[in-house]
Amino acid sequence: MLFAGTLAAQTPVPEWQAGVDKVKSLIKTNPEQASDAAGELLKGKNKKNVELVTSVARAYLDAGQLKEAETYLEMARKADNKAPAVSVLEGDIAFARKDIGKACQLYEQAIYFDSNYKDAYLKYAQAYKSASPSQAIEKLNQLKAIAPDCLEADKELAEVYYATNRFGKAADTYAKFIDTPVATEDDILKYAFALFLNHDFEKSLAVA
């Protein structure tokens, strides 16, 4: 995975998912067969299905095959160049090429096309959380303004606060999601440590 903590899918599995899984499994073992399977999958009206085309592109991206991912990105662009998923995919490819500035421009573009597209906010924040924590926090607060219950935003915010030694804010933000499936063991440890460093020793021991 390029990014951890992306949104968990709550929607039913699409009928073409098995085909994408087949492509994924063949990319490393038999690239030619993977390409044939992708071609078969993207025949006819399927090549206009943005979700499907971006899923195939992402299979190649996750395998580190950026040129192939870009080939399917072009197909996705032809299907709908204003779909936020297409901008996010292009941003992820730029991020994989270590071009963080370009990646974040593309995540911003996705938000311009659809201001409710949560993944774009999260990926922008993930890209900038080391290079520019203040920009990451600003983007996550924008997401919280439109989706107050977004636990993934809380998780990212907590990580940025923790990494920048704002342990009081980190502890308060960890508390919002620590009892949910979004929290990992690492989050629980950091929550306990943030409480400890914020001199909330009793609570820190209870969490740990």
List PLM regions with ranges.
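Short coil turns that delineate tetratricopeptide repeat
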Residues: 46-47, 81, 115, 148, ...
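Register position in tetratricopeptide repeats
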Residues: 28, 62, 96-97, 126-131, ...
